[in-house]
C-alpha cells in the first residue's frame, strides 16, 4: 500500500510540472522593458514565446502582479491575478486588477498553456513603475520660472486674420535652477523624480546629468498639456546634502524671431516643475518639490532656438553650482508661474546619443572661426573596405 501511495504522488507531480518545451520571454509593459513613469490605470502587457515545436500556438495565459517580488514568488498576486484565461493573445494584454498607486513599483510575471493543456514555467519577473496618475499627485509642486510671461498678442506672425494667438515673442533669458536639500540618514528603498521643463530641459543631481536623454520633454499643445519625464534616482542620492539642477532651453515652447525660423510662436518664458519622492526602508516618505525655495540664475546658454540652434558661452559658467558647497547668495529667487496644464507622462523613446565621431584635426580659418574635421566612414550595402 505504501508503494502505491508513493507512485501516485510522483505521477501527480509529473502531471502538474511545467513543460520545458516552450517558455515565455521578453516581457514588456506598454511596449517597454521595466518602464518607469506609467500613468495609465490599465497598462498593457506583452510577451514573446519560445517553442521547440513548429506551429506552436498559445491556448491560455495567466498574468500575476504584486507590489513586491517576494509576494509574487509566494503566489500572493494581490494586485492582479488574471487566472487562467483562454486566449492566444500575447500582445498588449490590459491590466484588470486593483487601482494602481502613484510612484509605485509593481512586479509581474506570466505563464502560458498549449493546446494540449500543458503549462509553461513562470517567466522571469519584470517590473513597471507608475508615474503621477493625477495632477493632485504632484502635491505642492509649482511651475517656476526666471521671468514673467509677456501678455498675449495676436498677429505676431502671418496676417492678422491668419495669426496664431501667442505670447509676445521676446528674448527670454535661459535659466538654470538650483535646489539644495538633505537626505535623511536612513536606507532608501526607492526614489523617483518627475520633471517637466519647457521647452526642453537637462536634469542634474550632485553635478552629474541624470539619464542619457536629450531634448526632453516632447512637443505638445502647451496650453493644454505638458509632458513630464520620470527618473529612477535611487542609486544617485547620497545621505546628507544633495543638489538638484535644471537647465532650460526654448524648444517649441518659445521660438525666438532671430536667425532662421518657420513657426513663430511663444507660450511664455521657459519654466519647470519637479516632484521628487523618496521612500525609506522604514516606509517613511520625503518629498522635494519645485517652489519658491528654489534659486535661479542665467545659464551659459545665451541663445536657444529649435530652428536656429544654440549658443553656449563657457565664460558664463559658474563652476560648482550643482554641488552642496556652492555659494548661491548671488542667485535670484524664482517666480511662481500662473500655468496649469494637464500633466502627461512622456512615453515615447527618448533622443539619445547613438554615435560619437572623433575630431581628427582642427584649425582657425581666416575669418577667425574654428573648423573641426571629424572621421566618419560611411559604407553602402555593396561596398567593402
Language-model regions, residue ranges each:
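Sec-dependent N-terminal signal peptides
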Residues: 4-12
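Boundary at the C-terminal end of the N-terminal hydrophobic targeting segment
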Residues: 16-18
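Pro/Thr/Ser/Gly-rich low-complexity, intrinsically disordered linker/stalk tracts
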Residues: 20-48
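Accessory beta-strand-rich segments of carbohydrate-active enzymes
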Residues: 47, 84-93, 105-109, 114-116, ...
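Short amphipathic, basic-aromatic surface patches that mediate peripheral association
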Residues: 49-53
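Recognizes extended acidic, P/S/T-rich segments that occur
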Residues: 58-105, 118, 140-143
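Activation corresponds to long, low-complexity, non-globular regions
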Residues: 288-373
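Single conserved hydrophobic/aromatic residue that forms the stacking wall/gate
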Residues: 378-385
